[in-house]
Amino acid sequence: MKYILIVGDGMADERQPSLGNKTPLEAANIPNIQRMAKQGIVCHTQNCPPDFACGSDIAHLSILGCDPYKYFTGRGPMEAAAMGIEVEPTDSVFRCNLLSMEDREGELDEKGFVSFNAGSIEGQDALDAVAQLTADPEVAAYLKANDMEIRTTPTFRQYLIHHHGDFKGLYFEPNWEGTPGPCKQVFPRGDEAKAAPYIGF
């Protein structure tokens, strides 16, 4: 027997005044989905355990029967594997976004986010942005000194590989939670010495 699993990740959306305070899903003409719901089983599930931030990465593991407490090590490793990025067992993989920040004077950690995905940057623009960053001698030296490298993709999603990194005891905020507000709110929290390599440049 074959099963089709349809996950409406984020499909519910939010209520819109222009739709009579209905969500787009409530207002949509979706007879096939309504028929499946009528003939199937409709229920509520909690796919993100209370100890985890609510996100599709954790929810999808849970939906597929994988215990997040056992298997979840962050969004980065799963996405990198899906992109065909090969790493060693001793590597730590972090998802990094290209983003837009306020263009004003002041300390970096006090500046706010404008867009968590740099306006959905993609293609050659995304590749050029990362190439410009890593070509900077200071950035290149920093990455080398901390045994790090950046693996690029033609999207706003990039991946930081930290070879032999030790981040136990650190909490990393999901990057989409950083909009809006000062960027320091998404700096790693916990052991300051361990956090330093991730916020140094």
Tell where the protein language model's regions lie, with residue ranges.
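Active-site nucleophile/metal-coordination loop of metallo-enzymes that catalyze phosphate/sulfate
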Residues: K2, A12-E138, I161
